[in-house]
């Protein structure tokens, strides 16, 4: 199973490296999301740049690239910790895509897909917290910064073996939002 773990970890990274925001913007003749809007290759920036349809497709694609490797790992009976590390690899692919000069997105939708595969109640909690925070603040980055860490106590209680990889995943997402944190603290963060 160790070799299957490494095979799936590599697959997850390579799948995570497929940036739906970049691919869909190229296919539709829209500007590269890394060079326009917020500069992020993700669904929120695609909503700003290309509208709802491409944003939804980006969101679903990014979510699926986190979910699919977990489902495959589960089908191969890899343990929950291994599945969690495979999910981290998918998010790393999204953050640092080999196909796009290691300039990717922030990993929120991909992380949601990972959580959906690992422990659906944690994904439901994260999505509900994200939607509520977005509704109340109109700030996508703040929603991500609240929703992702909020899942950790639930995972510690219900899936403790997934806690370490999901803590690493949370730290990656918070780190990737460090510019947004500065803007939030300075009152400059973009709102919808």
Curated annotation (Swiss-Prot):
Single GO biological process annotation from the record: phospholipid biosynthetic process
Keywords from the named record: Cell inner membrane, Cell membrane, Lipid biosynthesis, Lipid metabolism, Membrane, Phospholipid biosynthesis, Phospholipid metabolism, Transferase, Transmembrane, Transmembrane helix
Predominant localisation class: membrane
Classification via InterPro entries: G3P_acylTferase_PlsY (IPR003811)
Pfam families for this protein: G3P_acyltransf (PF02660)
Catalytic activity: an acyl phosphate + sn-glycerol 3-phosphate = a 1-acyl-sn-glycero-3-phosphate + phosphate
UniProt keyword annotation of rRNA processing present: no
Broad EC category: transferase
Membrane topology: Multi-pass membrane protein
Pathway: Lipid metabolism; phospholipid metabolism
Transmembrane spans: 4-24, 54-74, 80-100, 112-132, 154-174
Keyword Cell inner membrane in record: yes
EC number assigned by the record: 2.3.1.275
Subcellular locations according to the entry: Cell inner membrane
Assigned GO CC terms: plasma membrane
A molecular-function term among this protein's GO annotations: acyl-phosphate glycerol-3-phosphate acyltransferase activity
Family: Belongs to the PlsY family.
Biological role: Catalyzes the transfer of an acyl group from acyl-phosphate (acyl-PO(4)) to glycerol-3-phosphate (G3P) to form lysophosphatidic acid (LPA). This enzyme utilizes acyl-phosphate as fatty acyl donor, but not acyl-CoA or acyl-ACP.
Subunit structure: Probably interacts with PlsX.
The protein's name in its UniProt record: Glycerol-3-phosphate acyltransferase
Organism: Pseudomonas savastanoi pv. phaseolicola (strain 1448A / Race 6) (Pseudomonas syringae pv. phaseolicola (strain 1448A / Race 6))
Gene this chain is encoded by: plsY
């Amino acid at each position: 199973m160790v070799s299957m773990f490494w095979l799936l970890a590599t697959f997850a990274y390579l799948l995570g490296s497929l940036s739906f925001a970049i691919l869909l913007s190229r296919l539709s003749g829209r500007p590269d999301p890394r060079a326009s809007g917020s500069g992020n290759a993700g669904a929120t920036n695609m909503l700003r740049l290309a509208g709802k349809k491409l944003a939804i497709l980006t969101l679903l694609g990014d979510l699926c690239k986190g979910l699919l490797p977990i489902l495959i790992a589960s089908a191969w009976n890899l343990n929950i910790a291994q599945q969690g590390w495979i999910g981290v690899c998918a998010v790393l692919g999204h953050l640092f895509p080999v196909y796009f000069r290691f300039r990717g997105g922030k990993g929120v939708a991909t992380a949601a897909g990972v959580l959906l595969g690992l422990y659906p109640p944690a994904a439901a909690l994260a999505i509900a917290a994200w939607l509520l925070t977005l509704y109340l603040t109109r700030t996508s980055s703040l929603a991500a910064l609240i929703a992702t860490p909020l899942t950790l106590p639930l995972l510690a209680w219900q899936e403790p073996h997934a806690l370490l990889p999901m803590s690493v995943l949370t730290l990656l997402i918070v780190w990737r939002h460090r510019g947004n944190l500065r803007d939030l603290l300075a009152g400059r963060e973009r709102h919808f």
